Regions:
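Membrane-embedded transport cores of multi-pass solute transporters
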Residues: 1-10, 19, 94-181
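Membrane-embedded translocation segments of transport machinery
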Residues: 44-117, 123-131
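Generic preference for flexible, low-structure residues
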Residues: 16, 64, 68-77, 141, ...
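Signature of multi-pass transmembrane helix bundles
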Residues: 1-58, 65-70, 181
Length: 181
C-alpha cells in the first residue's frame, strides 16, 4: 500500500544521504570559491552576482547566491542588511560617496531590476500584444509588476515570458546585472 512507498523511500535515502555526506564538501568548496570570486572581483563580481541570481530564479537556486550576502557573512559579518541599517545615519550625514563608505553595498543592488526592470518588461509585453488582447494581457501583467516593485517577488512576471522567450530572459538577467553594477 501507500506505507510501502514511505518505507522504501526511507531505505533508499539512507545510502544517498551517506553519499552526500562524502560529496557535499566539494559542492561547499565550489560555493565558497564562487563567493570569494564575487567579493574580490569588484564591479564585475556585482555584475556576475546579480546576473547569476536572476538566471537561477527558475530553479529556486538563487537563494544559494543572495542569502550568504544579504543575511550571511559572505561580505560583512551578519550580512549586508544587518550592516546597512545601523549605519544608515552615518551614510546619510557623510559627504563621501557611498561606494567609499560601504563598497560591499553593491551586492544589495540586485533589487534594482525589480524596481525598474520588471515594470519595463510588463510594458514591453503589453505594448507588443495585439490591441484586442491588451486588456487581458494588462490584467495579468500589471498586478505582477506591482508585486515585483512592492514585494520583490518577480517570479510571476518572469515566468510569464521565460518559457515563451528564454533568450529574452537571458537578456533580462544580463541587463539586471548591468543595472546593479
Amino acid at each position: 500500500g501507500s506505507s510501502l512507498v514511505v518505507i522504501a523511500g526511507f531505505v533508499l535515502m539512507l545510502p544517498i544521504a551517506l553519499l552526500f555526506c562524502l560529496i557535499w564538501p566539494h559542492f561547499q568548496s565550489l560555493i565558497a570559491s564562487l563567493q570569494g570570486f564575487l567579493t574580490g572581483a569588484g564591479v564585475l563580481g556585482v555584475w556576475v552576482y546579480t546576473s547569476l541570481e536572476r538566471i537561477l530564479i527558475p530553479t529556486g537556486l538563487h537563494h544559494f547566491i543572495y542569502i550568504p550576502f544579504i543575511y550571511g557573512p559572505a561580505v560583512v559579518d551578519g550580512g549586508i542588511q544587518a550592516y546597512w541599517l545601523p549605519h544608515i545615519q552615518e551614510f546619510a550625514q557623510s559627504t563621501k560617496p557611498l561606494i567609499e563608505l560601504f563598497p560591499q553595498g553593491g551586492f544589495a543592488l540586485h533589487g534594482m531590476s525589480k524596481m525598474f526592470g520588471c515594470p519595463g518588461i510588463a510594458l514591453a509585453i503589453y505594448f507588443s500584444a495585439k490591441k484586442e488582447n491588451r486588456k487581458r494581457v494588462g490584467s495579468l501583467l500589471f498586478p505582477a509588476a506591482i508585486v515585483a516593485v512592492l514585494c520583490g517577488i518577480t517570479e510571476p512576471l518572469e515566468f510569464t515570458f521565460l518559457f515563451v522567450a528564454p533568450v529574452l530572459f537571458l537578456i533580462h538577467a544580463i541587463l539586471a546585472g548591468t543595472l546593479a553594477a
